[in-house]
Amino acid sequence: MAKIISYDEEARQGMLEGLDKLANTVKVTLGPKGRNVVLDKTYGAPTITNDGVSIAKEIDLEDPYERIGAELVKEVAKKTDDVAGDGTTTATVLAQSLVHEGLKNVVAGSNPIALRRGIEKATEVIVKELVAAAKDVETKDQIAATATISAADPEVGEKIAEALDKVGQDGVVTVEDNNRFGLDLDFTEGMRFDKGYIAPYFVTNADDQTAVLEDPYILLTSGKVSSQQDIVHVAELVMKTGKPLLIIAEDVDGEALPTLILNNIRGTFKSCAVKAPGFGDRRKAMLQDMAILTGAQVVSDELGLKLESVDTSVLGHAKKVIVSKDETTIVQGAGSKEDIDARVAQIRAEIENTDSDYDREKLQERLAKLAGGVAVIKVGAATEVEAKERKHRIEDAVRNAKAAIEEGLLPGGGVALVQAAAKAEKTEAVTSLTGEEATGAAIVFRAIEAPIKQIAENAGVSGDVVINTVRSLPDGEGFNAATDTYEDLLAAGVTDPVKVTRSALQNAASIAGLFLTTEAVVANKPEPKSAAPAAGADMGY
């Protein structure tokens, strides 16, 4: 494909127009009185949302230079969303403000590299001030407050606080459609996976068609269990103990399956066979998770273990196992806490290192099953469009609440940024800057006011008046846009997680630095649209 190249001011101006188009669309959603944006879809109903990253992803501009500028800001929103789960609109507003302030100086002749260094140094000092000002989350009410701010719905805040209180920080809170109007909250006890019994003959409870095994042994194998010889040895070992047996394998078929079923029906030996979840490497990883949770060893050729020669030391144990047609739940596995903690740490490290959203989601599910639990918030609404919008808000609020638990809380409404910047300006790390690095730092201190101004303007109040008033207030006090009052924001429950505020500033500063130091842009040349073919003479009917 042919390329077009532009340089210097022309390059930056085209990118700036794209940045502004995206940022101006996103920033109308900021704050408690922010508006929604309607996103048209090729198929199905449109989506109505106030989620910055969802809006940014939908914007695809025609002009190649504008598209590049918009893509840079999309990266700010996406990176902030990946790290913190919220703060995407704040990050976008900060990036726009930093770029505009910076370009004024570049046009006036400042060295972009020196400006970038100043921006980075000022950002680093402000982040330290934000972290130092953090307040730990100590109560369920604080979690509810921060989730309420994110979702703009007190009922959602309460449900999320209840869910996280039950499943813990590492637990998974999923959001699903509800057939009924309103919000419902369900919890899963223990490790649950989406595979049920291989045959209905294993059912022990006819009323709800489940197989319930009390205090069972658990056999985990990565291969198929097919021959009678495969199963008889293990069955005889377990029968001597008088306990039931759960078999989780790639498959149970051949002579092995009818052998288990017949013994089950006759009451000789109680058991249940289940297919292992997942495929390939993910199946192996999930089997290993189960092994650690239950204190078992996975029987596999790779480890040199054969079913016909194993003893009870390779079998796992649990207080109870409940198996339905579609899923299996292992309650209170007998694995050691040290082994489980080590596995949890390993999965956390994998989450940090993966670039794939899909892999990250699957790893987080595995983490929850090992370390916490699973809560499901079911959302029902009058229309499909309203339900989709509400689900978006709840998903954001869940991640916001988890970020608050992880790194603590700050006063919300953009106030924490302004007050941290005021302290940072007086530190030696900033006052010792000279020349154009000092100019770069000054760019950050001016741009940092953008979120609070935008929140005020979306609430119908002058941003400049709010900024001047907030500067004169004690730490922690600021403008509550929901009530149009100045008050102690932490006490009023107007809070932001440190992780969200910090990530928004760091990602905005990073992209702004790249933007200012851009001197040439190489873009794909737009292909001319082909004219529609003319109708033939015989097409007139």
Swiss-Prot record:
* CDD domains (UniProt xref): GroEL
Q: What enzyme class is recorded for this protein?
A: isomerase
Q: Where is the protein situated, by its record's location annotation?
A: Cytoplasm
The answer on whether this UniProt entry bears the keyword Cytoplasm reads yes
Q: Which residues bind ATP?
A: T29, L30, G31, P32, D86, G87, T88, T89, T90, G413, N480, A481, A482, D496
Question: What Gene3D superfamilies would the database entry show?
Answer: GroEL, GroEL-like equatorial domain, TCP-1-like chaperonin intermediate domain
Q: Which catalysed reactions does the entry list for this protein? A: ATP + H2O + a folded polypeptide = ADP + phosphate + an unfolded polypeptide
Q: Which GO terms describe its biological process?
A: protein refolding
> Which keywords fit this entry according to its UniProt record?
ATP-binding, Chaperone, Cytoplasm, Isomerase, Nucleotide-binding
**Known EC number(s)?**
5.6.1.7
* GO MF, one annotated term: isomerase activity
Q: Name the GO cellular-component terms.
A: cytoplasm
Q: Which PANTHER family match?
A: 60 KDA HEAT SHOCK PROTEIN, MITOCHONDRIAL (PTHR45633)
Q: How does it assemble?
A: Forms a cylinder of 14 subunits composed of two heptameric rings stacked back-to-back. Interacts with the co-chaperonin GroES.
Q: Which family does it belong to?
A: Belongs to the chaperonin (HSP60) family.
Q: Which HAMAP family match?
A: CH60
Function description: Together with its co-chaperonin GroES, plays an essential role in assisting protein folding. The GroEL-GroES system forms a nano-cage that allows encapsulation of the non-native substrate proteins and provides a physical environment optimized to promote and accelerate protein folding.
How is this protein named in the record?
Chaperonin GroEL
Which source organism does the UniProt entry give? Answer: Bifidobacterium longum (strain NCC 2705)
